[in-house]
């Protein structure tokens, strides 16, 4: 990355095409020093205005350029920062977010989340940022999983389907358990409102999904409640026709 008003360090600065790098936020220039094969210089804008969000955006822009070269690996030189871990995490997140594609219904798809051609992201830093890279990867993967689910139509992402995906999450993590209540269990628990809402859809069976993560233990209990209506038709008579297809995204709250 290059900040506005600054110049590339040598020997990269003497590489053909390097003078085209301006430092303007989101600007990109590719130079060919020989080793490595190519270097993408992305503008980071004013150094004083460089935030983790800008790092996230820069990483996303860089990924899209790298994708055009069918690159399998990206290496970042972490810009100097007071909190390098936060910026490292943001770079990984931005790369992961930009790699998301929804091709579930395209010919040849196996029905799972689309795999990216990118095999690795390396961040060069003198600081201990291993934890930050792991955090960024976790956030990106979880976000993209949610984006995949919200992109599915309501006839696929039914309450039963979401319960199955919750079960997959629990099976993949030792400290995560799942409990699912069906219509009978919901009714027995006195949750008449939830049961009533589900009657608005034909052949739709409600599910109450509870995922529990037991971490280190001994701390306070934190509960997050998400409404996941797989196709929200509430107030459909007063909603404009444009954007009706986005009602399926109401499930994102879960």
Feature locations, PLM:
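Anionic group-transfer/hydrolysis microenvironments
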Residues: 45, 184, 227-229, 234, ...
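Glycine-/small-residue-enriched capping loops at alpha/beta junctions
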Residues: 1-220
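Conserved mid-sequence domains
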Residues: 209, 215, 222, 226-235
